[in-house]
Amino acid sequence: MKVLIIADIGNRLKIEKYISSYKKFFHYLDSVEVSFFEKKYTDLAEFDCIVVDEYNLNEAVCLYRGIYNYDNLFLWFEGALICVSDADLLKSMSNKAVKAKNWSLAKKINSIRIDLNRIMKKAVIDTYPSQLQLESTSFCNAQCIMCSHYYAGNKGALDMNQRMLDKLSELLPYLDIVIMHGNGEPFTSKLFSESVEVYSSYGIGLTTNTNLSILTDDHIRLINQSFVNIRVSCDACTREIYEGIRRRLSFDNFVKNAIRLRDLCPDVSKTMASVLMRQNIEQLPEMVAFAAEYGFDEIIFSNLGVSLIVGNEKDNISNYPYLASKQLKKAIDMGSKCGIKVTIPSSFDLSLDDELICGEEIEIIHSMPFFRREEEILAIRDFAESVVGDEYRIVENLSDCFWEENLFECEGICEWCIEKPYIDLNGDVFVCCINASYRVGNIFDYDSFLDLWNNDTYKRIRTLFYNGKLPGFCDNCQFILNGSLKKLSVPSPSKDFYQRRHISKFYHDYCEANADE
């Protein structure tokens, strides 16, 4: 019998020794010939058995798409060989780990099983998420001009509660990471400290996005104790633009807290998150230097989410492609000088270079006021109330919307639909935070999270990905554009991909009703 071992050097000898010494494993064979993986092997047909360690599983699948069809495919895990087709064994190991409160082993097994489900393209999965984005509060002390709080304030806002924590206890043993933000400022949550302590008791690493307007000594303690990353929202490096974008916040207070975070939490990774818009496009390189000065490891620039309610289409810097190209290139160069990573969306053509057109675009940008007058904001709020009523946003069932036709090609599957859901404080579950208007289900409507995790909508989403089709709600996805998705790619997307698709049933019905008038 010929066996191919695909493993790290340290595991190769362990696996070979295991095979040679554990006679029961190949008791029916006279001899076993072991080979180690080399790039020259392009055809696996000559091997009767393949052994892959946990660290090379994903690479093996990338190299050999059909590897999961092998009857004799084994996983080297925790010092033993496990037949990949024997799903019950890993499940049993997981149950024992949870019972023993061995959280690290439970998480490790769950992650392996997630990979195996993905490799075997299972639409129905028996694993829990390894990451969870869970809203801590939907209250916010700011009214940023690109956010629903701009027109809705804290209408309909909720705070974390014990009922929610109890309902999610089913997931906690398996989670590696909890992302503690949603549509509010997490450091205003009344149960922030208690939530952190609960998550930490299960060995869960934490991260969150904050506007950094609040940073108490207790926050500092919790960040150092339990957080692997802090992501800070900041869209300008001057007082006028910062306070114009992030209404109700103080630039001086932000700088003070950024210094405290830098000096008192030196070992925690820090990321600055900035939304690209007309108002800040001229200071992008300065923002990179600003982020570096205050101890950030990375600055991520994201595209503006255009809102029909706010009417901010002209704030989108895609309207100013030559200036965007110039400023983004300067920002990247500044990152190299300052030693900070700069991440930008892939939707911009950085080859554009024309100073005359840049000047014309700057004139257009400054021909409109950067910020609205109070009476204009009140008019937006009145319009929003006429559209969404008492809620701060419209939430629809994804199953009622339009996202399964005329789709772009893709390779792989988005991790959000197999290991990383987003849950708000109503208990509504969404595919991701970008699509937080389209509900897949509600945790309080199901006895077990796994029942929701495998409802008809989730199965349809996974099946589309496995068939090489990108669901319609993924068009112009920020995670695809900034390259943060590890298991999904959209090769050579057309220009149409960079336009957000209107999948909303409410939007379709609204347009039809107005067309009839």
Which residues make up each language-model segment?
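N-terminal pre-core extensions flanking Radical SAM catalytic domains
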Residues: 85-152, 169-173, 347-408, 418-420, ...
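Conserved C-terminal portion of the radical SAM core fold
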Residues: 173-181, 200-207, 226-234, 252-400, ...
